[in-house]
Amino acid sequence: MNLHNEELWQKYLGEVIRVSDLNELQTVKVKFLGKKGEVTLALKNLKNLPPELRPEAGHKINTVKKLIEEDLEKREQELLQKALEEKLSKEAIDVTLPGYSLKLGKLHPLTQVQHRIVEIFTSMGFSVATGPEIEKDYYNFEALNLPKDHPARDMQDSFYITEEVLLRTHTSPVQVRVMEKYAPNLPIRIISPGKVYRRDDDATHSPMFAQCEGLAVDKNIRFSDLKGVLLTFIKELFGPKTKMRLRPSYFPFTEPSAEVDISCVICGGIGCKVCKGSGWLEILGSGMVHPRVLEMAGYDSSVVTGFAFGMGLERIAMLLYGIDDLRLFYDNDIRFLQMF
């Protein structure tokens, strides 16, 4: 039997040849295979034929139905592929075009200052040491020559958690822990940057702030070694023309002790409002490690000596960037932070 001469098949081909998208194809499908479609009606009309002709006529109609179904499936896949290619063509990305740049974050100014300080001291042979911010009273005070009845404890108002545990008031406990760990081995050269906590809050003080302390322990360490290290640090950080001045001071954990001043970075030492006309700015405290601190850490103070120093990173940053209110560092003001 020549199926191509069948009227129903030819009628279908005449309709489907004009189809250009999936919606039109669905319309043709419904027209021929739907409940009221051409093929469905032809099958229903079989009852009007004589019984002996029904099987052959039904076979012909089902053959045409199968051909239509197969052709519809084929055309549907072709149209789907065509639609996909058109979509991909419209959404194609030209990889040669410049992309959109992302806004990159920056390091906090205090972090930048800390990194610079660490860089300077590590270039002089110091290594970085860290310790817990929740500290034992022993390491924060007693091991640093500040027993419970020492009057110097009144110099610092502390955040106590229990009677024997507090938020550290300085990073000096790190120095004690390092000495205990390595005693009696020598030498020790460390810096210990980190957060510290005190009950203080005004334009030049914060209840939480950052410090960086340093320690060197060895045989025959002298005060002149301390002076040389600090002078190198100051000239690297503030510039080669910066001068340094040492003033006698008192710290329970060092003896002798000294405050370290630098020539004013604003006026160059001539005198201005920032330095209050003196030409000098205080930046850190220092001194030779107290013999009692060495002994408590496990060293023989008759043979071993050392020096220590400590500075507030906010103080250094304020001088470097000309900032007059420490609280700006912690206000999370994006306008301020974008300046650095």
Curated annotation (Swiss-Prot):
It catalyses: tRNA(Phe) + L-phenylalanine + ATP = L-phenylalanyl-tRNA(Phe) + AMP + diphosphate + H(+). Its cofactor is Mg(2+). The keyword Aminoacyl-tRNA synthetase applies. Mg(2+) binds at E255. Binds 2 magnesium ions per tetramer. InterPro entries: aa-tRNA-synth_II (IPR006195), aa-tRNA-synth_II/BPL/LPL (IPR045864), Phe-tRNA-synth_IIc_asu (IPR004529), Phe-tRNA_ligase_II_N (IPR004188), Phe_tRNA_ligase_alpha1_bac (IPR022911), Phenylalanyl-tRNA_Synthase (IPR002319), tRNA-bd_arm (IPR010978). This is Phenylalanine--tRNA ligase alpha subunit. It comes from Carboxydothermus hydrogenoformans (strain ATCC BAA-161 / DSM 6008 / Z-2901). The lineage of its organism: Bacteria, Bacillati, Bacillota, Clostridia, Thermoanaerobacterales.
